[in-house]
Amino acid sequence: MHFSKLSLASLKIAAPLAVALAVSSCAFKHTKYENPITVQTQQPDKILYDKAIHDLEKGRYEIARITLNTLMNTYDSSEYMAKAKLAVADAWYREGGARGRAQAEADYKDFILFYPTMQEAAESQEKLCMIHYQQMDKPDRDPNEALRAEQECRQVLTQFPNSKFAPEAEQRLRDVQEILADAEMRVGDFYHQRGSFASAANRLGGAVDQYPLYSRADEALWLEGDSYTRLGPRFRQQAGDTYARLVRDYPLSDFADQAKSRLKTLEMPIPAPDPAAEARMRFEKENRTKPGMFHRLTGFIRQNPDTNVAAKSGTPQMNPPKQSIPVTVPVPGSQAGFQGDVTVTPVADPSALENKPDARQQPQAAKPKP
């Protein structure tokens, strides 16, 4: 009887305990797991990233790059991997200098290669454009940086046409092409003044064909037409076509009336002005920034070119320049037949080439006595 009372008492104590354990077990299974790293603290990769950005904003570029490289080497699967890679390029870009620009260019290109679909890829391409845009020289200097800027700005528009950087890159491309066109214009004008009219027509025509938004395209056409006129009647058609293009595509030009007079002299029709071209020229004249007196006086000491006169509207040239053929070079045979007295006589007996002795092995004939 004593044993039965003890067992009954034990069961009364054990039953509630078992129920409590079962309930607590179920509650533990459905309780949300708390990551101890995210409770009142930050992820270590984020700590490194925030520290690097703080150093970057304070101008401590070398320290920022060391921290960012530590992040990328330690946490290669971090969500901040792409941002860290871009921040390294930005650190080089802000540091500047020849070394900084070269390193930034390489890092931006790597970022676009590894993350082409990210929004920051368009920003990286825009920075590539700016690296060379800021290093452009004047039109009479080395055009290498301007050509590189043209290439990188084009890439923004072709690879990221819908990005927020596209409108700004388009205007920069117009600025760059203004400088490149002005360089060609200066060379063509030099040839024209020296009387080398064939070279002048080639240079001036190529400048307008490649950069129709050039602020002095009308003057270039006028000099091109004048060069053809001075080359003689043989180039009458080319001169007339050039004057007609000036009247049609640049109707508000100061040279339009002179071009019409030349067309009358050549007895060629005067075309009607293009309404779209007229509207564009009117817009450019109203919105073109005119340099002040101080700007003109200090122009000779400035290293960077003046882009105030660059077009503010219109689609810039998106194709690379084509190699133009000077007007004095004969047209290839596929476009015009060759005229000459050269004749070809076929070999009647092909075996004669093998049977006859080699003339090079025969003794040289004696020279006649004087």
Predicted regions and their residues:
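Acidic, polar-rich low-complexity tracts and alpha-helical solenoid repeat scaffolds
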Residues: 2-13, 22-370
